[in-house]
Amino acid sequence: DIDFAAVLEDASAKGTVNVYHWWTAGGEKDAIESVIDEFKGAYGKVKTKSNAIPGGAGGAMVMKVKVLQQAGKSPETFQAHPGQEIQPYLDANMLLDLSKLWDYAKLNERILPGIKDLLTAPDGKNYVVPIGIHKTNVIFYNIHVFEKYGIAIPDHENITWGEFWDICDQLAAKMPDGEYPIDLGDRKGWPACQVFEDIMMGTDPKIYQDFINGIYNVEDVTKVLTTYAKLMDYVAPDHSSRDWYEASGQVVAGTYAMQIMGTWMQPLMTSMGQEYGKDYGIFTFPGTDGWFGMNIDGFVVSNDSADVEAGLRWAYNVSSTPVQQRFSALKESISPYTDTPDDCYNELTLKFKNELISDTIRSYPSFTHGTALPWSASMSLQTQVQEFATSSDHDAEYFANKIVNILKEAGVKGEWNLVD
């Protein structure tokens, strides 16, 4: 049995921690470097090895970790989304129960209200230490493009579907050949799936709840995909040839006016010298006013690595206030902890944080980002939705049948309660 207090309080301990994460884009890279820097300050004799596994939405991580574990080289700690995504690791019996770490670091008292349930596994234990929260249902737009083509920017961020289609129509009419109202940047598939998720929530939260609970019908999914097909009329036709961050670069360049993306796009915009309110603005995805699409990043610890104690020290340090302050400022993410001071946030991140803790805004779990659907179903869904987005005719009913079959085959049975 591990003496958690003794391990975590031993600042002179030696060892090596292999840290696997998926942060490679501008701003994200600086954020993870700041965590490593703080870790070195706390446990100076422990060597840190940073390993970036890009692949997006955490999908590539599960496969990488499985391979490492089978080779007897489980990483000491690695990034994960809480919820269904950690199930393959639990099935492999490779995660260390961090409930005692949670007690020692007083995480139960410190954690933001409303996210604790997402961080508790079905067996009642805690395996994840959260590091940051992002909102998924957001549209970023280039203010200069709107001004260039004389598109009136609404004085409110919670736009309706009608306002959204009107903006798309105006942009499409005025932008020259080779420039488009929207880009997806879905070379890796998951951004296309996240748009599907946003459209589903923006169509009807009840359809979303049923979908993640495994109560599905082809008609509902067809309805969502029909809206998606309409959206594709405004999207750059070569959208799947770019990664999400390359698409963001083209939004900054003015080739595309808008991108539907989570708030991890913020630090990327900052790294490209873009300022919120001056260079870019945001809309809440149409139909999702009053909802916060939840994406929680965290770290888990392997119970079978070469240095389990080093992994524990890393996970503990992630929740410390100095790490949270530096990381949240650079990543422009919301700290999961109530004792992280608000002065580490810029204007936009603070706005999102206030939304998250507001009594009038409800959060919902992402199925693209590992929380709400089994990992295998989420991966298959990403592939299928990307195929839909890249298909020439966007046949909603055909793909709705394929998507429903994915949930059937995965035996999806959820107990999510989003709508009264």
Where do the PLM segments sit?
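Conserved C-terminal helix/tail region of periplasmic/extracytoplasmic solute-binding proteins
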Residues: 2-5, 11-12, 16, 147, ...
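Extracytoplasmic "Venus flytrap"/periplasmic binding protein-like
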Residues: 34, 38-114, 118, 147-150, ...
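A structural signal for short loop-to-beta-strand junctions that line the ligand-binding cleft
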Residues: 67, 75-76, 107-146, 180, ...
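Long, aromatic- and glycine/proline-rich binding clefts that accommodate carbohydrate-like moieties
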Residues: 119, 280-283, 329-383, 387, ...
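Extracytoplasmic/periplasmic solute-binding protein
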Residues: 123-132, 137, 147, 162-213, ...
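Glycine-centered hinge/linker elements that transmit conformational signals in sensory
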Residues: 166-170, 210-241, 285
